A protein has these predicted regions:
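Residues that act as N-cap/strand-start positions at coil-to-secondary-structure junctions
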Residues: 172-174, 204, 222
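Short polybasic amphipathic segments
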Residues: 207-212
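Long, ordered, helix-rich scaffold segments
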Residues: 75-76, 80, 112-113, 183, ...
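Hydrophobic alpha-helical and helix-loop surface patches within well-folded domains
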Residues: 1-200, 314, 321-344, 358, ...
Length: 567
């Protein structure tokens, strides 16, 4: 739904609606006025539209801080997907009609492609970027183009070697990690392809804009290794402007973490993102995320506070089968959020900022995860004494979830399904879906899965949303995974001709985390690898689950020890 009620639509939904409208309007230029010649240059349409969502809405609503949203949403998605061996490049060949649907990978042709355009915009400057686009549209109006046509216009406008630089980035899959080794007045920089999980050897190199915190004699790292002279501890990718991960040596890392509260917001997000994904890849121990997150518990910027909370959430996979350790993580999560929640309370105050509204949601989510009795009882009171439509929209999903999770009754479930079916509000429907899929009750999970196949209750286009919410809930993960395999013929019959056909596979791969689940995934989906629309998603799914299983085996003991020590 692209209609917003000023009184009822939550801030997050208003932002989403605005970006969707901006995305589609931008296709008047990127897609209609100038159109890609063939599907391999789909990014000329979608990567640009992705970037323009944020350019346009940031200009219209600067108080929304859209580039912080870009950093936490698009950049995070691009980093995680692009770190898997076998991922497609932004510009990808199409050898079979059924492969066209696979090009629409939201993390690559949308998020990564958009990020690469942000990178070149920052590299050449706004004036040259605008001039290059103006020339591109005038020269190719009502014509078909290839990627090189755009890069040539940007190169002419900027006087920089954009063609060679950007062709490497869009044609080469994956991303680099830049390792920084500092001495007193110099730093050795080296690059290699960044992987999470099993991978083939790679000698890939990128021309990497460094965007450093000080002038360097090398602005673009083109080679495997180089030395630069520095005046102070070196920080790279300032403003989160380029598509790479930075691994600092211990002394520089300690310096940045010690001073993280003094950094600009996007730099804080960059450090948190790098720390999280480096831990996933085994460059750092996942236990290091705990003190990093706790150091930011008084952060007032919602995106940074949310990223720190996300670092704590990363640790949940390590306590999946350990009740005592899970209780420890719950207590730590509650303590992380307590001061912020006590500051903001349950109810919005006059003149409250968007940041405070979003911080309240994040803090309340962690307080509920911690099973704070006072918070859960207040959630029950508010649920019992209000119509769903009257609950505050920013925290309504949390209130419903807390009640389903801790105070579920058969009548409650029936009433929520009835409300879902009868409400005209897409926002309320989504909040109910989040709430119902938080259940601990296997029978409720089974009822949800049965209703997914009933289009009179859940529309087919919403089916994967219910599924992903359910499979990411610890108590229902196995139930949802069994259902997917048992009902694959229905998935195939319902979505086989749609570009969302592989969504169920991709969502399952984000949640499965045990060796047995990995074996089951392989056994069930590997025979389908000859289906063009599914092949890449299946292979990437195996890599993703394998990496998660390996990560848990490698870091679990250290994470459990860190949890115990922190308490």
């Amino acid at each position: 739904c692209l209609l917003a009620d000023p009184e009822l639509t939550p801030e997050s939904s208003r932002r989403f609606i605005a970006t969707v409208i901006a995305h589609e309007l931008s296709h008047q230029w990127f897609g209609n006025l100038v159109t890609m010649q063939w599907w391999n240059d789909l990014w000329l349409n979608e990567s640009f539209a992705n970037m323009m969502e944020y350019v346009a809405i940031d200009a219209l609503q600067p108080d929304w801080h859209m580039w912080e949203d870009f950093a936490t949403n698009e950049v995070t998605a691009a980093l995680r997907r692009d770190s898997l061996d076998g991922v497609q490049s932004v510009q990808a060949d199409v050898n079979h009609p059924d492969e066209i649907s696979t090009l629409f990978d939201p993390a690559i042709v949308y998020a990564k492609g958009g990020r690469l355009l942000v990178m070149v915009r920052k590299l050449i400057g706004e004036e040259a970027f605008r001039a290059g686009l103006k020339s591109y549209f005038e020269k190719f109006a009502y014509k078909n183009t290839v990627g090189n046509d755009l890069w040539q216009e940007l190169e002419l406008a900027s006087g920089q070697p954009i063609v060679n630089l950007m062709n490497t980035w869009i044609s080469q899959p994956g991303l680099p990690v830049v390792s920084v080794s500092n001495s007193h007045d110099a730093a050795i920089l080296s690059q290699e392809r960044f992987f999470i999980g099993e991978h083939q050897p790679s000698d890939a190199l990128w021309p990497i804009p460094l965007f450093a915190n000080q002038p360097l004699d090398v602005k673009i790292l083109n080679q495997k290794e180089t030395t630069v002279y520095i005046e102070k501890p070196l920080q790279l990718n300032c403003g989160l402007s380029a598509h790479f991960v930075t691994k600092y040596n211990e002394s520089t890392r300690e310096y940045l973490l010690k001073n993280i509260t003094e950094l600009p917001t996007l730099d804080k997000i960059c450090i948190l993102q790098d720390a999280t994904i480096l831990a996933r890849a085994g460059f750092e121990n996942s236990a290091s995320l705990l003190p990093l997150a706790l150091s930011l518990k008084t952060e007032t910027n919602e995106k940074v506070f949310g990223m720190a909370a996300g670092a704590l959430t990363e640790l949940r996979k390590f306590v999946d089968d350990n009740d005592a350790a899970r209780d420890s993580l719950k207590k730590i999560s509650g303590e992380f959020a307590r001061a912020t929640f006590e500051e903001l309370g349950w109810d919005e105050k006059d003149g409250e900022s968007d940041d405070d509204r979003e911080r309240r949601t994040t803090a309340l989510s962690l307080m509920m995860y911690s099973e704070d009795k006072e918070v859960l009882n207040e959630a029950k009171t508010r649920f019992d004494n209000n119509k769903l439509e009257d609950l505050p929209t920013e925290i309504r999903a949390l209130i419903i979830s807390a009640n389903v999770r801790h105070f579920e009754t058969p009548e409650m479930i029936e009433n929520l399904f009835a409300a879902y079916k009868n409400t005209p509000s897409n926002d309320l429907q989504n909040d109910i879906a989040i709430g119902l899929t938080s259940t601990k009750n296997p029978k409720t999970a089974e009822k949800i899965l049965a209703n997914i196949k009933d289009s009179n209750i859940i529309r087919p286009q919403d089916a994967s949303r219910w599924f992903v919410y359910l499979i990411r809930t610890r108590e229902s993960r196995q139930i949802a995974w069994n259902w997917l395999r048992e009902n694959w013929a229905w998935v195939e019959g319902t979505f086989g001709e749609d570009k969302s056909y592989d969504d169920f596979i991709r969502y399952a791969a984000t949640a499965l985390l045990t060796p047995n689940e990995l074996d089951d995934f392989r056994q069930f989906f590997e025979p389908m690898e000859n289906i063009p629309a599914l092949s890449r998603t299946i292979k990437l799914g195996i890599t993703e689950i394998s990496a998660r299983v390996e990560l848990i085996g490698r870091d679990k003991a250290d994470v459990l020890s860190a949890l115990q020590t922190t308490l």
